[in-house]
Design a protein with these regions (language model features):
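Surface loop/turn motifs at the tips and blade-to-blade linkers of beta-strand repeat domains
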Residues: 82-85, 153-159, 199-207, 259-263, ...
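Beta-propeller domain segments
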Residues: 25-73, 111-112, 127, 132, ...
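Short loop/turn segments immediately following beta-strands, especially the blade-tip
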Residues: 140-145, 183-191, 301-307
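Asp-box/WD-like beta-propeller blade repeats and closely related beta-sheet repeat scaffolds
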Residues: 148-171, 176-218, 229-232
């Protein structure tokens, strides 16, 4: 009997040791083998895949900018504080009179139960993204042109995780996480006097993992909205991804909406090349294929484009985690124009034509890189 009990004890100990070693191996962070520069450009390195059971987690502590300090600017440029005291400013929109609108928002309330929910809640809190959303758009005004806003007012309140803004004629459009709203715009107002009209509902069901809704107006007045996927690679079922991982087209005059381009995991920033009808976007690609995959990117978007998500990435590389493979779609996958490095998380973009930044910066695009949470070493955190 003792021999049997001893055998069972040894067997259990071995199982625990094997399980512990396996868990350790599976959860070890994947250290990048290539630099962000090598993973960027028109022909970035396509590293070998490392399918992760647990993501590499590397979330920097948020400290903010101390008084008197600012980001380091490139030679010939300078940075100064325009306004402060904002609550998670997400996007900005400059009105024709020079006033600056700022969307202040966080993720809408989410279910934080279960292991996944608790882990995500902890990560967001560490990154400074916890708490209740301000759900407002503030107006900043620099009347004397000294580069500092003297006026800061709550322009629109009571929104639902607002993100994108666009002005067409005398109508200001605001993209909430769940709907596109239209407000009557009156130049010079410091508080919106008009009431909103809902134009269309936007995808926001499920976990609403990528909740931001970027927005840009085309030269003809139509609107384009970037909607991120509700998952990493469609693991919760593609029925939850209807009109997600897409750029949507909205025609406000008759409240018509359709999918303009698809297979784009999270098209956060949208902008038109100045003087043209050519639409561009910056995209956050998928996770858990290692620290070197997949490069986020900058690319143009035309009607009917398909960028491969979730089955493919970067023009046709297969993601083996997605089943069944959609081989019939592979021939239609468009390759992005420019890689921005893996996990750099590009959020905002603007073209520099017409800006007073000097000749060196007069013909290009500025892209704000939020920075990684799942890469070792960290990447991004720059413009």
């Amino acid at each position: 009997m003792r021999k049997i009990l001893k055998f069972i004890a040894v067997a259990l100990l071995l199982l625990v040791l094997i399980g512990g070693v396996t868990l350790y191996i599976m959860s070890r962070p994947d250290v990048a083998r290539f630099s962000t520069a090598e993973l960027s450009g028109r022909v970035p390195v396509m590293a070998s895949q490392k399918t992760e059971t647990f993501p590499t987690i590397n979330v920097p502590e948020v400290t903010g900018w101390p008084a008197g300090q600012s980001p380091r600017a490139a030679q010939g440029l300078s940075v100064q504080r325009f306004a402060d005291g904002l609550d998670h400013p997400r996007t900005m929109f400059v009105l024709p009179n020079g006033d600056v609108l700022v969307a202040e928002a966080q993720s809408p309330p989410r279910d934080s139960s279960g292991i996944e929910g608790k882990v995500m809640s902890r990560l967001m809190s560490k990154a400074g993204a916890g708490g209740v959303s301000a759900n407002r758009i503030s107006l900043l005004r620099d009347a004397d042109g000294d580069g500092k806003a003297e006026v800061k007012t709550a322009y629109i309140t009571g929104l639902s995780s607002p993100y994108g803004m666009a002005l067409v004629g005398d109508t200001l459009y605001v993209a909430n996480t769940d709907a596109l709203l239209a407000f009557p715009y009156v130049a010079g107002e410091t508080k919106m006097s008009g009431k909103p009209t809902k134009v269309v509902d936007l995808p926001a069901k499920g976990t609403n993992r990528h909740w931001t809704k970027s927005l840009v107006a085309a030269p003809n007045g139509w609107l384009y909205i970037g909607v991120g996927a509700d998952s990493n690679i469609g693991e919760k079922g593609m029925n939850r991804e209807f009109r997600r991982a897409s750029v949507l087209e909205v025609r406000p005059e008759n409240k018509y909406m359709r999918t303009f381009a698809a297979g784009i995991r999270n098209p956060v920033g949208l902008a038109y090349y100045p003087g043209s009808d050519r639409l561009w976007t910056v995209v956050n690609e998928r996770d858990m294929l290692g620290s070197d995959l997949v490069p986020d990117y900058l690319t143009d978007v035309t009607e009917g484009d398909f960028y491969g998500w979730p089955w493919y990435y970067w023009g046709g590389f297969v993601d083996p985690r997605v089943e069944p493979e959609a081989e019939d779609r592979r021939q239609y996958v468009k390759r992005p124009e420019y890689g921005l490095g893996a996990h750099t998380a590009p959020l905002g973009m603007t073209f520099t034509q017409g800006l007073d930044l000097g000749e060196r910066w007069s013909n290009g695009a500025l892209v704000a890189l939020h920075g990684s949470w799942n890469r070792e070493p960290a990447a991004g955190y720059s413009v």
